[in-house]
Amino acid sequence: MIIDTTEVQDLNSFSRLESLKEVYGIIGMFLPILTLVLGITIGVLVIVWLEREISAGIQQRIGPEYAGPLGILQALADGTKLIFKENLFPSRGDTRLFSIGPSIAVISILLSYSVIPFSYHLVLSDLNIGVFLWIAISSIAPIGLLMSGYGSNNKYSFLSGLRAAAQSISYEIPLTLLCVINISLSNSSSTVDIVEAQSKYGFWGWNLWRQPIGFFIFLISSLAECERLPFDLPEAEEELVAGYQTEYSGIKFGLFYVASYLNLLVSSLFVTVLYLGGWNISIPYIFVPELFEINKVGRVFGTTIGIFITLAKTYFFLFISITTRWTLPRLRIDQLLNLGWKFLLPISLGNLLLTTSFQLLSL
């Protein structure tokens, strides 16, 4: 039997080509995820640096200045130090719950970034239930805090976990009602559709102007969800030492801080998406994709401009959150729950009823 060497070479080249296609397919599948994770990491490092600089300015002192230019590498240095610290475990605690808690808190928040549009159709997963997915995922993080508090076998940690769960339930309901209002205004629960619905009318089409009361309630509720001052009752140092973080050290201790800043960033991004038109350039009847959709280079430039606009709006609200933390005193636990159940929830419910009534009358 004679085998043609040309046919064998063709078969080998074809198999190599198919293998390269599979490799490129795998790289193409994971590249957006890796890019998003890298961007989130850089964003968190910038937030940590901004918080240190803003707090130093408010307190009239010098902030970090030795680790890199203007101290911009201080957060990276702190993270590196925590990685090499020893991981201690409570002798009588539940080791499994103690170890799983920080991971659940971080992973549940990271999943929320998959539905956030950073520019025109620049989103990891454009789901029809994007907003509801964020609400569902954000309710998982307090479970991790409760597991950490229970697994620590410490009364302060356990009480902190209970506070985190109670605070989350109290402020997730107003958040959900406000998200339903935005969904009804846009006729879609997709984050991309909500941004495009606001982009049709430029600056005055933002939900900020159509729902000003809802915007302020959303801002307050998102701060409470992030457990930031004046709502950091689960970590109240004067009452609970360090809350659910009391028994932690090393990288697990650092994961809680990462989760806090990740949650703050994702909340600010959702404020931008739901109320500030996302990547909208704020010129009436013109938005980024129509302005730059001339050729391939124009589309890349338009996408870059959209990312810049989204991040500029996001970091504006991060500045507000950081300033609020360093200027307002902490609430008591009874004041926190009263604010959520007796004020924000009734106002959110009334706002929902009024909005839906006007929409039904306009049909």
UniProtKB/Swiss-Prot annotation:
Keywords: Chloroplast, Membrane, NAD, NADP, Plastid, Plastoquinone, Quinone, Thylakoid, Translocase, Transmembrane, Transmembrane helix. It is found in: Plastid, Chloroplast thylakoid membrane. GO terms for cellular component: chloroplast thylakoid membrane. PROSITE patterns: COMPLEX1_ND1_1, COMPLEX1_ND1_2. HAMAP family: NDH1_NuoH. Belongs to the complex I subunit 1 family. PANTHER family: NADH DEHYDROGENASE SUBUNIT 1, NADH-UBIQUINONE OXIDOREDUCTASE CHAIN 1. This is NAD(P)H-quinone oxidoreductase subunit 1, chloroplastic.
